[in-house]
UniProtKB/Swiss-Prot annotation:
The gene is ZNF81. This is Zinc finger protein 81. Residues 21-92 form the KRAB domain. It holds the Pfam family KRAB. There is a cross-link at K266 (Glycyl lysine isopeptide (Lys-Gly) (interchain with G-Cter in SUMO2)). Disulfide bonds: none annotated. GO terms for molecular function: DNA-binding transcription factor activity, RNA polymerase II-specific; RNA polymerase II cis-regulatory region sequence-specific DNA binding; zinc ion binding. It comes from Homo sapiens (Human). It is linked to A chromosomal aberration involving ZNF81 is found in a severe intellectual disability patient. Translocation t(X;9)(p11.23;q34.3). GO terms for biological process: regulation of transcription by RNA polymerase II. A zinc finger (C2H2-type) spans 330-352, 358-380, 386-408, 414-436, 442-464, 470-492, 498-520, 526-548, 554-576, 582-604, 610-632, 638-660. It is found in: Nucleus.
Length: 661
């Protein structure tokens, strides 16, 4: 029967079996665990390839209801194919093919260009092969019910495979047209050399290959390859033909410009049956096996002269070329921001709509992306699957472990072009660069204060709300931010990780160390515009400026007295509460202020750090030292307003005033 007699015309719906078979030929499924192993770049590549494949099917007259996975990908979601879903159904139910759990790709994505490490899984090979055999029997039963399906399937396969594409390689300005002789599998019957059996139709070979995969795993064609799909077999045959597809005269590149429909890999997981004859290297994935084979033969996949990456599918090459050329074709209509991939644009647009469809069942918090929700949920479970081999610290995400390990290696790839400072993460570099640009994107709606980081804004807003969610397990004290809690805990542990290289003094936080180091360099970066006085740190500078403004924002609720600094108010309030939290370990005497405790402890140690240069007399505290120096200078700063007499000390002036009263 001619192939076109029973073939569906463009726009005509085929049977459910036909639709499912054809769509599976361009589908790759991942389980939740496998999807989590892919990085963000691999996921975006998967999304773009799947969407492009679907559009190509529509362009050749293949009309079906939009699959659920396409709906998800258009929304920027990932394909969550869970094990145990999509059970076997009859042909009449519209299911014809392999369960997603049987079409899983072992390890990383098949379209990734570089060969990854081998993926070791605990899946039982024999149970998978048994299920594959059952699938073959199911397909045979469907075939007996629908004799016309074979010719329709053959027609559709030919139509897809013979679709010609014009590929423009912009680096050289040439159009490359694939030869019609490329489709070698359509010019002769599909044949298995190791069995000597020929088949008339693609589907017969598909069934036969799957059946014999369970029986003859170790039997080979040319070098140990077993196929479960006829398109995979045809693809493999081309590696032995030595055909040069389309050669570029100007650059000498040889490109196999095939259609962009990705191949559905169906190979038993965990079995190392793909062996390269050139190097003897064993691969667990077909895609990894084909990549080196194409390099050994005269056939070459798409290559880039600018880098070493190799791609076996054109859509991946197109996306990668955009990265090299910095082409951003997808533009946001709201803000004008441009993106290389459509999936990135879809994800970005949710920031304008404020749509957060993914909600945590534990706390009700919502997220833009599924990946963000999954990352958040680990905070509730406390699960930390990834452990650092150096220090044993655990992490809930592999990406967080990779970032952490750079602390041990000292690796800092991201360098600031302005000041040369290097960072372990690109996001940290971007945050740092806002210091140079002055950009403060995060603004408080209550007081208008702007911040460089969103985390700083969130911590600041808790000043207005009074929220202190982080509580110390040792003393019960609460803090508005996690970093403040971690810093506070060092009081209990005595940890001082930041050490001065000049004098060896240790500090609980980096900012105190930075301030201290300026005492060695003499640097005073903050200068008062009113009086010209300079300060080593911003906090003291801000405190000083309130002297000129007269502002005293901190008021005591008991007596109404106002103070410039919050710390002064806290110290003052201890007069009303009689609280003395600072206790001497030697004599158990208590003090309301920490500086008073330090001065007191010098009585026990005998330390007198303040020495008079005139007479050599030493003092335990600065105030007594300053009083003593007025004897040598003759300075009497405290004067009586009634008689004008001057005194060296304020206490003596107070005693003198009693004469006038």
């Amino acid at each position: 029967m001619p192939a076109n007699e029973d073939a569906p015309q463009p726009g005509e719906h085929g049977s459910a079996c036909e639709v499912s078979v054809s769509f599976e030929d361009v589908t790759v499924d991942f389980s939740r665990e496998e999807w989590q192993q892919l990085d963000s770049t691999q996921r975006r590549l998967y999304q773009d390839v799947m969407l492009e494949n679907y559009s190509h099917l529509l362009s050749v007259g293949f009309e079906v209801p939009k699959p659920e996975v396409i709906f998800k990908l258009e929304q920027g979601e990932g394909p969550w194919t869970l094990e145990g879903e999509a059970p076997h159904q009859s042909c009449s139910d519209g299911k014809f093919g392999i369960k997603p759990s049987q079409r899983r790709i072992s390890g990383k994505s098949t379209f990734h260009s570089e060969m990854e490490g081998e993926d070791t899984r605990d899946d039982s090979l024999y149970s998978i092969l048994e299920e594959l055999w059952q699938d073959a029997e199911q397909i045979k039963r469907c075939q007996e019910k629908h004799n016309k399906l074979l010719s329709r399937t053959t027609f559709l396969n030919k139509k897809i495979l013979n679709t010609e594409w014009d590929y423009e390689y912009k680096d050289f300005g040439k159009f490359v047209h694939p030869s019609p002789n490329l489709i070698l599998s359509q010019k002769r019957p599909h044949k298995r050399d190791s069995f000597g059996k020929s088949f008339k139709h693609n589907l017969d070979l598909h069934i036969h290959n799957k059946s014999n995969a369970a029986k003859n795993l170790d039997k080979t064609i040319g070098h140990g390859q077993v196929f479960t799909q006829n398109s995979s077999y045809s693809h493999h045959e081309n590696t032995h033909t030595g055909v040069k597809f389309c050669e570029r005269n100007q650059c000498g590149k040889v490109l196999s410009l095939k259609h962009s429909l990705s191949q559905n890999v169906k190979f038993p997981i965990g079995e190392k049956a793909n062996t390269c004859t050139e190097f003897g290297k064993i691969f667990t994935q077909r895609s990894h096996f084909f990549a080196p084979q194409k390099i050994h033969t005269v056939e070459k996949p798409h290559e880039l002269s600018k880098c070493v990456n190799v791609f076996t599918q054109k859509p991946l090459l197109s996306i990668y070329l955009r990265v090299h050329r910095d082409e951003k074709l997808y533009i946001c209509t709201k803000c004008g921001k441009a993106f290389i991939q459509n999936s990135e644009l879809i994800m970005h647009e949710k920031t304008h709509t404020r749509e957060k469809p993914y909600k945590c069942n534990e706390c009700g918090k919502s997220f833009f992306q599924v990946s963000s929700l999954l990352r958040h949920q680990t905070t509730h479970t406390g699960e930390k699957l990834f452990e650092c081999s150096e220090c044993g610290k655990g992490f809930s995400l592999n990406s967080a472990l990779n970032i952490h390990q750079k602390i041990h290696t000292g690796e800092r790839h991201h360098k600031c072009s302005e000041c040369g400072k290097a960072f372990t993460q690109k996001s940290t570099l971007r945050m740092h660069q806002r210091i140079h640009t002055g950009e403060r994107s995060y603004i408080c709606t209550q007081c208008g204060q702007a911040f460089i980081q969103k985390a700083h804004l969130i911590a600041h807003q808790r000043i207005h709300t009074g929220e202190k969610p982080y509580e110390c397990s040792d003393c019960g004290k609460s803090f508005p931010s996690k970093s403040q809690l971690q810093m506070h805990k060092r009081i209990h542990t005595g940890e001082k990780p930041y050490i001065c290289t000049e004098c060896g003094k240790a500090f609980t936080n980096r900012s105190n160390l930075n301030t201290h180091q300026k005492s060695h360099t003499g640097e005073k970066s903050y200068i008062c515009a009113e009086c010209g006085k300079a300060f080593t740190d911003r906090s003291n500078f801000n405190k000083h400026q309130t002297i000129h403004t007269g502002e005293k924002p901190y008021v005591c609720a008991d007596c109404g007295r106002a103070f410039i600094q919050k710390s002064e108010l806290i110290t003052h309030q201890r007069i009303h509460t009689t609280e003395k939290p600072y206790k001497c370990p030697d004599c158990e005497k208590s003090f309301s202020k920490k500086p008073h405790l330090k001065v007191h402890q010098r009585i026990h140690t005998g330390e007198k750090p303040y020495i008079c240069a005139e007479c050599g007399k030493a003092f335990t505290d600065r105030s007594n030292f300053n009083k003593h120096q007025t004897i040598h200078t003759g300075d009497k700063p405290y004067k009586c307003s009634d008689c004008g007499k001057g005194f060296t000390q304020k206490s003596v002036l107070s005693m003198h005033r009693n004469i006038h009263t």
